[in-house]
């Protein structure tokens, strides 16, 4: 099972957890969860006016070996207006635009989508059962 929790944070709200959204999916090949502004295809939906987040920004896909992968999907713009980081404990990694990284099995961490133009972020915590 992959469990996700999402909080949208703006300026003075840093550290607040009000309005947290949750989603989970079984670790089965082909299972998928998405994060973005499009309510039709995303399990976790960000505010409509947060344009630094694409309609479908992040995708969590379970592969054939039951390992989850995080992808930052390429949007309609050639240059993104955000940056995405994967943080697991003391380890932090920038996720490339249009790129994919595996999530650690039996681990927990956070994916941070940071607005490049202001103090806003989408923080997605994850727990991947081992």
State each model region's role.
Residues 1-51, 61, 65, 95, ...:
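Intrinsically disordered, low-complexity acidic Ser/Thr-rich regulatory segments
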Residues 74-77, 93, 114:
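Residue-identity detector for glutamine
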Residues 35, 57-61, 66-87:
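Short hydrophobic/aromatic patches on the structural cores and recognition surfaces of FHA
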């Amino acid at each position: 099972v992959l469990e996700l929790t999402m909080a949208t944070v703006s300026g003075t709200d840093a550290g607040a957890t009000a309005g947290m959204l949750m989603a989970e999916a079984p670790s089965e090949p082909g299972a998928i969860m998405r994060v973005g502004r499009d309510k039709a295809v995303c399990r976790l939906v960000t505010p409509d006016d947060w344009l630094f987040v694409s309609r479908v920004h992040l995708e969590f896909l379970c592969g054939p070996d039951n390992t989850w992968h995080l992808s930052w999907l390429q949007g309609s713009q050639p240059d993104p207006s955000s940056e995405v980081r994967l943080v697991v404990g003391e380890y932090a990694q920038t996720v490339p635009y249009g790129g994919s990284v595996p999530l650690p099995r039996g681990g927990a961490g956070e994916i941070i989508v940071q607005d490049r133009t202001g103090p806003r972020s989408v923080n997605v915590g994850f727990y991947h059962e081992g």
